[in-house]
Amino acid sequence: MANITVTFTITEFCLHTGVTEEELNEIVGLGVIEPYEDDNADWQFDDRAASVVQRALRLREELALDWPGIAVALTLLEENSRLREENRLLLQRLSRFISHP
């Protein structure tokens, strides 16, 4: 099964996500998403970046956060997810050593 990655130019990305170019520059500057550059040095974004921005927009709407606050919230949510997965794996390993009556 092949993985397909969709890429967007700046204009396409803004149209797809609903952010302005100014907001996109701020989002990139805060490290919320990272563009990759092709040979002609234009920013390109993948579908994962679009998902992150859509999640960020939901946070902005639901919590009335500014972009720096959203960057912090996304970082904390990602860290929480990583820690939950690590905890799940550790519990799985621990269960091998604990006998269940």
Curated annotation (Swiss-Prot):
Task: State the InterPro entries in the record.
Answer: CbpM
A Pfam cross-reference name = MerR_2
Check the record and name the NCBIfam families matching this protein.
PRK10265.1
Give the protein family: Belongs to the CbpM family.
Quote the function comment for this protein: Interacts with CbpA and inhibits both the DnaJ-like co-chaperone activity and the DNA binding activity of CbpA. Together with CbpA, modulates the activity of the DnaK chaperone system. Does not inhibit the co-chaperone activity of DnaJ.
Q: What is this protein called?
A: Chaperone modulatory protein CbpM
- What is the originating organism of this protein? Salmonella typhimurium (strain LT2 / SGSC1412 / ATCC 700720)
Primary gene name: cbpM
